[in-house]
Regions:
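Short, small-residue-biased leader/transition segments that mark boundaries at the very start
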Residues: 1-6
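Core dinuclear metal-dependent hydrolase active-site scaffold
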Residues: 7-70, 146-164
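Cap/insert and terminal regions of metallo-dependent hydrolase folds
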Residues: 57-146
């Protein structure tokens, strides 16, 4: 299950509710660690459900979230800054692909990649590996360049592999 602490929601308006959901990470830096709860978020409107993973290691919470919400239209998923030593707080690309499938996402936009590298992998490895891991999944992998618009409802929109 998701635990009572995560059964929080904020009704922003009649057309937007934000749900606070689990993630597997930590909060803070230095001596002020874990004084706040880390989390992921589901944005629910009458038209669609958009999930934002935040930083998270892979875990059963993704499947539980997918089951609770009956899938998601768009999942914005962490995909980068991973290392075997950080596996409990940052997903490797194959785990991002599986977490997206666990959510029953229709479309996935990877985040946390293609910019400054804090881990030992190359800047483009997260996208290369996620593209490979997503080939047999039931979601559309959307990989816009920085600033490129994404039309969530347009199932014909395609993006070039700009990281190659």
């Amino acid at each position: 299950g998701l635990g009572d602490v995560y059964k929080r929601q904020v009704h922003i308006s009649d057309t937007l509710t934000i749900h606070v959901l689990p993630a597997r990470h930590f909060s803070g830096r230095g001596i002020k660690r874990n004084q706040t709860l880390w989390g992921s978020f589901m944005f629910v409107t009458p038209e669609r459900k958009v999930y934002y993973s935040g930083d998270s290691g892979y875990g059963p919470h993704f499947k539980a979230i997918g089951e609770l919400f009956g899938g998601v239209d768009l999942a914005i998923m962490e995909n980068g800054q991973y290392d075997q030593d950080w596996k409990y707080i940052h997903m490797h690309p194959a785990e991002t692909a599986q977490a997206s499938a666990d959510l029953n996402a229709k479309a996935v936009v990877p985040g946390h990649n293609g910019r400054f590298v804090l881990a030992k992998h190359t800047w483009n490895d997260p996208l290369i590996q996620l593209a490979k891991a997503s080939k047999d999944k039931n979601y559309r992998l959307l990989t816009p360049e920085l600033g490129e618009p994404v039309r969530v409802s347009d199932t014909t929109q395609q993006f070039r592999e700009w990281w190659e």
